[in-house]
Structures are given as structure tokens and as C-alpha cells.
Curated annotation (Swiss-Prot):
InterPro entries: YEAST_sf, YEATS, YEATS_dom. The lineage of its organism: Eukaryota, Fungi, Dikarya, Ascomycota, Pezizomycotina. GO terms for biological process: chromatin organization; DNA repair; regulation of DNA-templated transcription. Pfam families: YEATS. Keywords: Activator, Chromatin regulator, Coiled coil, Cytoplasm, DNA damage, DNA repair, Nucleus, Transcription, Transcription regulation. GO terms for cellular component: chromatin; cytoplasm; nucleus. Component of the SWR1 complex which mediates the ATP-dependent exchange of histone H2A for the H2A variant HZT1 leading to transcriptional regulation of selected genes by chromatin remodeling. Component of the NuA4 histone acetyltransferase complex which is involved in transcriptional activation of selected genes principally by acetylation of nucleosomal histones H4 and H2A. The NuA4 complex is also involved in DNA repair. Yaf9 may also be required for viability in conditions in which the structural integrity of the spindle is compromised. Residues 173-194 are annotated as: Disordered. This is Protein AF-9 homolog. Residues 10-168 form the YEATS domain. Belongs to the YAF9 family. Component of the SWR1 chromatin-remodeling complex and of the NuA4 histone acetyltransferase complex. It is found in: Cytoplasm; Nucleus.
Length: 268
């Protein structure tokens, strides 16, 4: 972490967000995924856990290192992965059981931010409330994908880090140099209008889903619809229960009245 006096002041009333993905992918050993030599016989799957940018964009300009704390039965169970521009933070292993993985994020020195901790549950088998949800976890090549969309929020970042985060979005793989020689630079191309191409150094989210990219504005809209439908169902259930309660209260009042009338008649 850089000395605070070199980072400038905090940019007040400012929040910068950066989307990223935390997840794991597992695949059972088979003819198409043979068990490597030297792997114990009781290991049933190969798997990897990762932290990466949305649509595989580079996140090493704000994240420099990730620590993965695996199950203690795994040799060298605390793995430190240094950032390489353009590559995800990944650990690959084999095993037979599911467990919680502790993930610690270390930000670039210019951020002045302390590390933060996340948790991810390694899934080797599909899960869900029904078969449809379970099958949705299995990709076409038989992999079990357990991914979650996350957003890193930097609240009132230091000026140096704020300038780094907001230096401008660029297309993936774009280089400022236009050719050999000094002074030959080029400006980035026009910003995309369809929003289905995610640029580097941005908080962009693709407009539509595609293979290997389950998170998009389309996904968000589908989740909002599900929540709206669930809210509507909950409201209908509440109305039905209230109507039943009202009917039972009226029935109770009628029975009380009949009992009082019968008691009065018996006395007279």
C-alpha cells in the first residue's frame, strides 16, 4: 500500500464500481476428462476456482493479488495468485468433496485500500430447487458452473486511485500505439452503442447473454421479472389469507352471538 501522503485526498461524495465474477467450474473424470497421473483414486473431479473480470476483461489495474484458502486437507492449501494483465486469478485442483473457499482480495498499491474477504462454496454436483435449475448449472461440455456476479465498490477513493479508475474505457486488446516511431498514437474508437461489447477499464455490462457469459442486462431484467412475479404471488397469498381470516372472524362473531342468545333464552 502506497503512503497516504502520496495518494492525494479522498474524492468526496464519489463511488466507483467495477463488476467482476467469483466462481468455480468442476468436471467429473471421464473418457473426455481423464484422471491425470498421480492423482489419488478417490478424487472424482477436476476443478478450478477463480476471480475474473466480466466478459474476461482485465481487472489487474485495480486488483493486484488474490489469496485462495482451500480445504486444509489439500497440500499448500493457502494459494497466493499474483495478477497478470489480461488473465484471471485462478487455482486449479482435483478432489472429491465440496467446501467453502475463503477468498481475500488485495488491491493495487495506489488504491490505499485494505484487503477484503469473500467466500465461495465449491460445487462439484449440480444443485437447485428442481431438475430444471440443476440442469441449468451443467454446461454443454459437462462442467458444473457455480458463478456469482459481484460488484466492487470504491467509496470516496483517493485522487490517485480515482484517476486510475476513470482514465477512460478502451476496447479489449486495444493498444494506443498506431505504429512505429515516436508520437504515433491513436484515439480509442467510438464508444459502442449496442452495449453488448464490454470495454476494459469500465463498469459496462453486456446487453445480452451468450455462451460463457451468463451475466448481462438481459439476466438482470429476467431477475427483476422473477422478483415482480414473486411479489405478486406473495400479495395474492396475503389477500387470500386476510379474506379467510375475515371470514373466520365473522363466523366467530356469529357463533358468539348465537351462544349469547341461547344462554339468554335458557335463563328466561
Amino acid at each position: 500500500m502506497a503512503p497516504q501522503n502520496q495518494l492525494g485526498k479522498r474524492v468526496k461524495l464519489t463511488q466507483v464500481r467495477r463488476p467482476f465474477i467469483v466462481g468455480s467450474t468442476a468436471k467429473p473424470f471421464s473418457d473426455t476428462n481423464p484422471r491425470p497421473a498421480g492423482i489419488p483414486d478417490n478424487h472424482t473431479h477436476s476443478w478450478q476456482v477463480f476471480v475474473k473480470g466480466l466478459d474476461d476483461t482485465d481487472i489487474t489495474y485495480w486488483l493486484r493479488r488474490v489469496q485462495f484458502k482451500l480445504h486444509e486437507s489439500i497440500p499448500n492449501y493457502v494459494r497466493m495468485v499474483e495478477g497478470e494483465p489480461g488473465k484471471p486469478f485462478t487455482v486449479e485442483e482435483t478432489g472429491w468433496g465440496e467446501f467453502d473457499i475463503t477468498i481475500k482480495l488485495y488491491y493495487v498499491n495506489d488504491s490505499g485500500e485494505k484487503p477484503q474477504t469473500l467466500y465461495h462454496y465449491l460445487r462439484l454436483h449440480p444443485y437447485g430447487r428442481n431438475e430444471e435449475e440443476k440442469q441449468a448449472m451443467i454446461s454443454s461440455n459437462g462442467e458444473i458452473c457455480s458463478w456469482s456476479y459481484e460488484e466492487q465498490l470504491f467509496n470516496e477513493p483517493y485522487e490517485v486511485f480515482y484517476n486510475l479508475l476513470t482514465q477512460g474505457a478502451i476496447p479489449k486488446g486495444w493498444k494506443p500505439s498506431g505504429g512505429k516511431g515516436k508520437g504515433k498514437t491513436r484515439a480509442p474508437p467510438p464508444f459502442p452503442t449496442d452495449n453488448n461489447e464490454v470495454w476494459e477499464h469500465s463498469a459496462m455490462i453486456p446487453a445480452h447473454n451468450r455462451p460463457g457469459q451468463p451475466f448481462s442486462l438481459e439476466t438482470e431484467a429476467a431477475e427483476i421479472r422473477k422478483l415482480a412475479e414473486a411479489q405478486g404471488q406473495a400479495e395474492d397469498m396475503a389477500k387470500k389469507i386476510l379474506a379467510e381470516l375475515k371470514a373466520k372472524e365473522e363466523q366467530l362473531a356469529t357463533l358468539k352471538g348465537e351462544n349469547q342468545a341461547a344462554a339468554a333464552a335458557a335463563k328466561s
